[in-house]
UniProtKB/Swiss-Prot annotation:
It comes from Aspergillus fumigatus (strain ATCC MYA-4609 / CBS 101355 / FGSC A1100 / Af293). Belongs to the glycosyl hydrolase 7 (cellulase C) family. One of its GO terms (molecular function) is cellulose 1,4-beta-cellobiosidase activity. The biological conversion of cellulose to glucose generally requires three types of hydrolytic enzymes: (1) Endoglucanases which cut internal beta-1,4-glucosidic bonds; (2) Exocellobiohydrolases that cut the disaccharide cellobiose from the non-reducing end of the cellulose polymer chain; (3) Beta-1,4-glucosidases which hydrolyze the cellobiose and other short cello-oligosaccharides to glucose. This is Probable 1,4-beta-D-glucan cellobiohydrolase A.
Amino acid sequence: MHQRALLFSALAVAANAQQVGTQTPETHPPLTWQKCTAAGSCSQQSGSVVIDANWRWLHSTKDTTNCYTGNTWNTELCPDNESCAQNCALDGADYAGTYGVTTSGSELKLSFVTGANVGSRLYLMQDDETYQHFNLLNHEFTFDVDVSNLPCGLNGALYFVAMDADGGMSKYPSNKAGAKYGTGYCDSQCPRDLKFINGMANVEGWEPSSSDKNAGVGGHGSCCPEMDIWEANSISTAVTPHPCDDVSQTMCSGDACGGTYSESRYAGTCDPDGCDFNPFRMGNESFYGPGKIVDTKSKMTVVTQFITADGTDSGALSEIKRLYVQNGKVIANSVSNVAGVSGNSITSDFCTAQKKAFGDEDIFAKHGGLSGMGKALSEMVLIMSIWDDHHSSMMWLDSTYPTDADPSKPGVARGTCEHGAGDPENVESQHPDASVTFSNIKFGPIGSTYEG
């Protein structure tokens, strides 16, 4: 995900590290959600959302000079990582006007293209300075989503990562912006497109993208476990745990980061592939999509349960279960139709069998597998985003992938989208009005957040 260049008329306060500007007040859009104790017994929580720091206007602490424009840094203000952090400030956001982000009660709508801005990434806040932390173990997480306006190549994602609740302020005193300004992001790709990591800029080694006018790849990445509850559009969906060797955020260097942004995908300390359950990829082509069993033309409720071996909030993660509720009917997740792979939930046995059946390298097991994922689930931050994919055009989600593989081979077909349909150039020009709407977030013990 990438910051988009903004222009404001501003003066900023000077200080001595990753700074905060004063031109646009930072007002987090309110978003309510519910904490449940038993079925039908839920209490409303008053939260808010904050946009990631990577999208924000970054300018000189002394005036309105951009520190970053398009996909390049200002070399005078940012000759190195430390100087850049001292010289540059993040400013507040116009959520609706600049980023196409609006809230109403429990509803969050993310628009795809707004002016020059493409996509967004938002975090749920506990208060103005702190991300909301969740312990997913022995709990379920439920939300409503409308994906009807998400065509091929787009991803309206809801997921968790093991970010610091304060955005890294206490660990890295040079970070003066913190969670209030959306700092501290990490995930299992160890993303190197972040402009700041651990309170320092990522300008050293920065290479502007050849395909994305707003993004680039820096010398460092930010790694942490990632639980993808929902990566989806109107064609395909996947739920995917991604463990890492460390349960909290760490910084990596260069191609040793692995993941999407590096020469060697599996060189890092995280699992960039995960163990995914995509109904189409698992052989059921009539389960999810327009007019299918889970009909993406209508809003749906998505329930994800994190079962522990001993039924406690600190037990070992043993299973991730998915079900849906639509039009008052509970719909069990589709069952695998792949030879040698059984079940309709994510377990250690499922993941081992799936990797074998698809001929995929088992990086999931290498980095701890399901139990490793479970160790990170006690302190997770909720993320909601909309994005397109400059690396592989989202074909890993909704098309056949790898592109040169036999589509009849197990695991290659992931959805009905044609090659090229999801190219960012196409979706940004043909579907700028695409959007995703999340609402009615509920969290509580198993069985407490839905009826049916």
